[in-house]
Amino acid sequence: MSSEKLNVIALISGGKDSFFSLIHCIGHGHQIVALANLFPGPGPDSSSAISGGQSPFRREDATKAGSETNLQTPSDLSSPVGFQHIDPGTRTPQPPGPATGDHDSLREAQGAGESSDTDLNSFMYQTVGHEVLPLYADATGLPLYRLPITGRAVRHERDYDATANTQDKVQDSDETESMLPLLQSIIARHPEANAVCAGAILSTYQRTRVESIALRLGLVPLAYLWQYPVLPTPSADISADTQLLLDMANVGLEARIIKVASAGLDENHLWERVSSEAGSSRVKNALRKFGSAQGAAALGEGGEFESLVLDGPSSVFKKRIVIPEQGRRIVREGGGCSWLMLGGALLEDKHDATAKPAARIPNLLDPRFKTVFDDLPQPMNELKAAKACLTLLSQDAGTFTTDSEVLRWSVLPDLGLGEMSIQDETAQVVEKIRDLVSGAGVQLSQITSTIIILRRMSDFPQVNGEYGKIFTKPNPPSRVTISCGDLMPAGVNIAISLAAPTPRATQDRNGLHVQSRSYWAPANIGPYSQAIDVPVAAQGQPTGLRCISIAGQIPLIPATMVLPSTPEKPHELQIVLSLQHLWRIGQEMKIQWWTSSVAYFPRANSSEIQRSAQLAGYAWKQAHGSPDEEVDGDNGPDLWDLKYNPAYMSLGNDDKIARKALPDWEALTLRQQNEPETGIPPMFAAEVEELPRQAAVEWHAHNGLSGIEEASFSMCALPELTLPGWKTWHSAVTTTSATASFCFPGHLED
């Protein structure tokens, strides 16, 4: 994957997020080739049979309208049932406005027996306001393709598994799969399309479903708004949770609230222009009354409200949509939910030629890591002092109980079988892994982490193809990949180390696998997750701790997936940027403390390696900061969490869902809180042959820990009496049932 310009299909719901993601695509030089939309469909086989209605446009009208302006569509192209193609310039018939009293004709257009007074309320698709969607073709000058939603929400798990529909012999298809024929039909008409964009901000539920469909079709998934609230704001005075709305306002995006479903917001907030400073402030103030004004809630990510875009920058909107007041009828569903049924929508030419600024691109580095970067390079004597302080760890006496419920293997191909291709070697290693895992009574999907060591990094594409065959489920293990050249055993070109829980371990496994390009952290396209999170047990009993394995992080720019090319301190930037990636993933996984880390560097002369190690050591120390700098990084839950995750059942108390800071200094024992440098985890440097993408550094955190109680974590270093010069670093966590110790040995040179 590179920074090539992409031809993008934009998934739109009519809401603010999907259009703002489209605007960011244009800002990166990508071309939007088509708009795509899914809307409630009729009949018992569709999700609308449960609680929705059909588009208020007759299908024959839409089909006729779509054929009035031929978009070079071959006549032999097949289309799924209900497929709509609406060209720019087409005047799609509008249904009568609710204020005219002609509701019979409106219902007739929707289909007999279907109620229009109920929204679909899907976790996946926004459908309120769908009656206006056909106007977007003419408003934007882009072809619009639409398809009715079929099926229902069969798969309720957060991380979508498309294979489960077949394996579980589910009769009804999941509503997610409606995207597949829609995008296939668009690709047939626009074969140049190679990417798809969506507006996911914090919803893993939505993001993983779009990614599943996109990757099956060979499309690059783009989610430029992903984790937007944690990205740097232009000013420290601006609240991060509403910065997105202000950025929308700055580019001229006009988004109106058309549905409210939250304590704090009522029908008086309908038609509020949320993409404005005043509107976003009013929404946040209303939500604050019920303790839910932070993070996701202020953006509507928890389902608090939904919006409809009427206008935007001239790069997207050639005309604006106008809906008269008499065309906005309030529908009250009960339970605090109300929305607007819209009619009489019109298009108006835009007379204001004032150019709006381009969409703000968040800074590459957070303030914390920008400070770390600005402080590099330090004079060599200061760097050496920083390195030394990493070894000034306490040597507390004490007995720590350890009880590993982790299986570990290192797998190499068989020697003595003659020369094999790297693909054959990998296939043999993969088959050995299958046998080992099966013999241990665990599943391949339970593997938590792997380390791939290659002789040549150029072999990686062939290795990845075979390796990926054993990880077909969501959230594959995290992975670190390095090349060690001729340090590999003779005749061996690949070795894989892996870890998995024992069969008796609790199978409570969470993962983070972001495969979309964003501004947040590099996308992991392929069979490896950013992080895997499993519980820690002692003697078969839960401790409340969780251990997180993080993939190796190289310094790719997340939005473009290329290495930075800045002339200013390029080596230092790579060290700091990849460390920031590690931190962002750790914060998303609610990690409170690292046990240790290693920074891998490609082969270079000794002075360059020494300087790289010292720079990384200084950056590692500075990234930990001090207890005085601790901040809260909560961003709130998404809609799936609110319904299915017990930790997020109430919006009324943000303290219940607040994330701990990384590092969480309050987790340290009181003595180490007073001596913070003694609590910084050890960081090691290792010289290897090559790194992926010819990167200058790869950060590998050995373990991240969460669930640590206050004042229960300590770091200590104990000398190995039988091995002069060696020490073992212990990260010890005391719980109510046990003390868990995570160990890492290292050799110290004088």
Regions flagged by a language model, labelled:
Residues 2-7, 63-64, 73, 77-92, ...:
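ATP/NTP-dependent adenylation/nucleotidyl-transfer catalytic domains that generate, transfer
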Residues 38, 199, 259, 453, ...:
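Conserved residues at the C-terminal ends of beta-strands
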Residues 225, 257-262, 311-314, 486, ...:
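Short, structured patches in soluble enzyme cores that scaffold and shape functional sites
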Residues 238-239, 243, 247-305, 312, ...:
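Ordered, small/hydrophobic-rich secondary-structure cores
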